[in-house]
Amino acid sequence: MVVFLFILYRQSDLKFKSMNGVIIVNTLKKRLFVATTMIWGLSVTLPVLAEYKPIEQPVEPANPSLKIESRNDLFKEKYPKQYQTWADTSKSTDLDSVNYEDPRVIVLWAGYAFAKDYKKPRGHFYAVTDVREILRTAAPMTPDAGPMPMACWSCKSPDVPRLIAERGEAGYFGATWASGGSEVVNPIGCADCHDTTSKDFAEGKPALRIARPYVLRALEKIDHKFDTSDRTDQRAALCANCHVEYYFAGDLKQVTFPWDNGITVDAMEKYYDDIGFVDWTHAVSKAPMLKAQHPDYETWMLGVHGKNGVTCIDCHMPKVQGADGKVYTDHQIGNPFNAFEHTCANCHDQSKEKLQAMVKSRKTEIKDVMLRLEDQLVAAHFEAKAAWEAGATKEEMKEALQDIRHAQWRWDYAAAGHGGHIHAPDVLLKVIGTGLDKSSDARTKLVRVLAKHGITDPVQLPDISTAENAWKATGVDIEKERKAKAEFLKTVVPQWDKEAREKGLLPAEK
């Protein structure tokens, strides 16, 4: 009966929420006294966040014998088809801003760099360019300036495993992002997936390799040791170089995958809670937040394709036939529908149009419930702010803030990924659904706290209908950020490229 009562008011609240962000608070108050009168003595107290105690991570020493050739342009002549299709990822030029498309995210990430600038992904060719230009990396004018650590380069370039081999993990991670500007200059390319210095590679064989030590360690945690995996698992694991959930551990800010308990949203959440890890404290609600990255490998493994051995490569890098009749792997990683006959049609009997309609429908359904969760979270953050302003104590707030943390972690797990609506739509819907439950739990608890401090009227939400309004509501001076970045791109980045050419890491200017 208790659970049934809660489900009743949650479903009703969600219908109101899609119409008006203020009405839901009032609706929630009315139902609260009906439902909680019967269950007050039966409520379960959830464990609150522990003090941060980072797990000590292995640190790989320098390995001078590991040779990594990170310059993509050196392989243009030997592998012209592969190189040209890789270069064709430059045709993916759109830089649509999620912040402008959906200003709610500015509130959800308030106090974190993603609130300033978050764009939809484009081709691997732009990996280095985009991380330089994004407002999130700020405008460090000297090598020692912050705020970002060296770890922020880790997914962007084959220069990263080269530097780790040369310096060791402590030497690589223990530096600022700005200090790597003239070293990390080649975008995601050949040496990220292949042993480009090996005899096998020279003879035209794939020579698949993962050279980032932290990735190899993570794969072992889930019994996917790369060296002993079969070819299918190895091909998929290459994408785990980057398309995974991770965090920066300890003072070293070492890239670490939270896979000790498994790869599900609950398993990773437990890992973070057990060690008390917090990405940032929310600027509005003061909740101890987690920021999901892009758990694509995890959702793929949990979905129908992963369970049936259909890998990332099968769908995004198919075998195609060149004009000379020879078959090669297409390196223009992108939408499988762009190469339908070589990807989807290998397994599916449906027409391209029918499959596209099915995928579009799933995407729309997931987006709809995701936006409902965003609305709940936006309201929860501002209701928490109102509770603090009314005099709430840390003890009174801790359970509601923990619910906000868990709810937004689930939203972000679904939102941050690429293609989850096709990789594992059932997984995403479940994740978002439990996020809605937890956001409702948070708001229920906040109503009690607000009432205890004399707040019985609905909490008025600020106008966040545009990105500019949302930045204003959360205290972001976006024009100041843009001006600083423009100066950085004008003065610092050209110097980085000049130094990289002097080191031989980039080809000479033509």
From Swiss-Prot:
Which EC number(s) does the record attach to this protein?
1.7.2.2
Read off the InterPro entries from this record: Cyt_c552, Cyt_c_NO2Rdtase_formate-dep, Multihaem_cyt_sf
**Pfam families on file:** Cytochrom_C552
**What domain of life?**
Bacteria
Q: Name one GO cellular component term.
A: outer membrane-bounded periplasmic space
Sorted UniProt keywords? Calcium, Electron transport, Heme, Iron, Metal-binding, Oxidoreductase, Periplasm, Signal, Transport
The keyword Transmembrane helix belongs to this UniProt entry's keyword annotation:
no
Q: Could you say which residues bind heme c 2 here?
A: C190, C193, H194, H331
* Location(s), subcellular: Periplasm
Q: Which residues bind heme c 4?
A: C312, C315, H316, H423
Q: Which reaction does it catalyse?
A: 6 Fe(III)-[cytochrome c] + NH4(+) + 2 H2O = 6 Fe(II)-[cytochrome c] + nitrite + 8 H(+)
Tell me yes or no: is Translocase among this UniProt entry's keywords: no
Molecular functions per Gene Ontology: calcium ion binding; heme binding; iron ion binding; nitrite reductase (cytochrome, ammonia-forming) activity
**Which residues are listed for heme c 3 binding in this entry?**
H124, C239, C242, H243
Protein's job? Catalyzes the reduction of nitrite to ammonia, consuming six electrons in the process.
Please identify the protein, giving its name as recorded.
Cytochrome c-552
**Which organism's genome codes for this protein?**
Pasteurella multocida (strain Pm70)
